[in-house]
Amino acid sequence: IGSEVVHYTDKPLEVGSTVTGKLDWDRRFDNMQNHTCEHIFSGLVHQKYKFENVGFHMDPDDITVDFSGEIPMEAISELEKLVNQAITQNIDLKIEFPSEEVLQAMEYRSKKELHGVVRIVTVPGCDRCACCGTHVRHSGEIGMFKILDASKHRGGTRVRFVAGERARRDYDWRVKEIAKVSALFSAKPNEI
């Protein structure tokens, strides 16, 4: 609330008592990987097409991003390749809190009416955006990125993707499913 971090508890705490918080690191890191990857992807879409990210949802299984314009379907795999190149480059993210003067002159995605201290997250060469979310320190920590689906949606484009450990789990599941179908038809995976 304001500039203070507030934790809600299931029961009152005595003033002066010692408390211990526990962070679910696997969940946090998963969110960091996928959220940072969303920045890279949305930033590259914005650079190439000038489309805005107008919707974002982090489901436990995948991420959905809605864009303000129609991304050509033939460009989807090229964008995926560019995101994976950015991951491979292990780019250092930059977090800054620019002064109001500097912020007014700064180019960044999602310029909304912002007041007070504004946190800018930059993935050099990919994205610069006002954001209060959690991120990895280096793009290489994301691991991998895979677009699952892209479709026209409300005059724009909806893209579903996975990154990091979610992408590895998705790939593992797909390999197992292909192996089942391959065995069912007594065919090599590349022949089904």
Where are these regions (language model features)?
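Active-/binding-site microenvironments in catalytic and ligand-binding cores
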Residues: 1-192
